[in-house]
Amino acid sequence: MPLTLLQDWCRGEHLNTRRCMLILGIPEDCGEDEFEETLQEACRHLGRYRVIGRMFRREENAQAILLELAQDIDYALLPREIPGKGGPWEVIVKPRNSDGEFLNRLNRFLEEERRTVSDMNRVLGSDTNCSAPRVTISPEFWTWAQTLGAAVQPLLEQMLYRELRVFSGNTISIPGALAFDAWLEHTTEMLQMWQVPEGEKRRRLMECLRGPALQVVSGLRASNASITVEECLAALQQVFGPVESHKIAQVKLCKAYQEAGEKVSSFVLRLEPLLQRAVENNVVSRRNVNQTRLKRVLSGATLPDKLRDKLKLMKQRRKPPGFLALVKLLREEEEWEATLGPDRESLEGLEVAPRPPARITGVGAVPLPASGNSFDARPSQGYRRRRGRGQHRRGGVARAGSRGSRKRKRHTFCYSCGEDGHIRVQCINPSNLLLVKQKKQAAVESGNGNWAWDKSHPKSKAK
């Protein structure tokens, strides 16, 4: 078919079919000047164009030429035929509408005329005695129309007469009936698909209702005969839908906690619908959604210490992650925990230290004796030394029994509340600046012990 030829030709030349047109029926003896003059006269409203190629079609005993326009085809200005040498030249372009759009238009037309595909076939088949139209129907088109009618008729019948699913509103389920949320979603989708009058939609809606739901809609129709289907669905939503008030949405969000055996990422997925309902009921503002989500995860889920500290830091800096970023972070942490498994502590504590240094004497270097299988704990070469007067590493050899003297225990306290055992980033207690000031003063007065005194008061070298 010519349309197939156009599509194949454009595909072979890597062209956009929306900018190409195929001209058929050009006589073989048509000169180049005559062809250009005819083409310019016919395509002057379509803008600039160029000839891609030409070929000879044996079945028509004529030439076919492919043109490419500089812009998309304007179907309102496109001629169906071009008057030229040897008769009109046929113009073939890609249809404006796809097959699905064509079926929708055909469906709406048949509904407006109250006809079916069988009626269309009957009218076309019986209308043989009428006067010949200006453009005769070719046998190929007639065969295509019959094939299309036979293929489209079951689809149209299914679209026109597809019944809605049953909904009753009873607490005792009826066979074939759905829950309200699923039924409402299905019904709304079908109403958008139907191209029928409002009265027909209302009749089909009444056919699928049973019990209390039917009584509600019947009462509404008795008080208002012109009620729309959307108003009926809104009334059913108020009667049978879930009750989501401001207070209920707030309580549901606050009472959401991680269940036993539930992953944190699964808890976040379960928390998200509750958070969105809270936003819809104005419990949470949209600009604070991420902060509220992070707050609920910190208070309602069991998190590893490192992950909790990281999320707390995000919360304090007012830079909470979004929903997808938070789920990705939690899943990566869960995958890491699952990969390490029970050997996590042993793998994290495994560290290969460099060889212990030798004691420098006047004679030479004497290696230190090794005690058991332990290594001397020295930082690696890439370790960044802490800055501070009393934190420089001293040279020499560790004394016997002072194996842990290199890594001294430091007295840490929070610079926010003044309590021991945590730092300011991890603090959740109220601020106590007076206690912090007292502990800072005590630390300054005590100094760093004998080690700091030796560093600040070095002994004079013997000459």
From Swiss-Prot:
Tissue specificity as recorded in UniProt: Expressed at high levels in the brain and testis. Expressed at lower levels in the heart, trachea and kidney.
This protein's GO CC annotations: nucleolus
Listed Basic residues bias regions: 383-396
Signal sequence interval, chain numbering: none
Localization, UniProt: Nucleus, Nucleolus
Main location (coarse class): nucleus
Region of interest called Disordered, as start-end residue ranges on this chain: 363-410, 440-463
GO terms classed as biological process: positive regulation of apoptotic process
Keywords: Metal-binding, Nucleus, Tumor antigen, Zinc, Zinc-finger
Source superkingdom: Eukaryota
Pfam families listed in its UniProt record: PNMA, PNMA_N
DNA repair listed as a keyword: no
Additional note from the record: Antibodies against PNMA3 are present in sera from patients suffering of paraneoplastic neurological disorders.
Record-stated family: Belongs to the PNMA family.
Record's protein name: Paraneoplastic antigen Ma3
Source species: Homo sapiens
Protein encoded by which gene: PNMA3
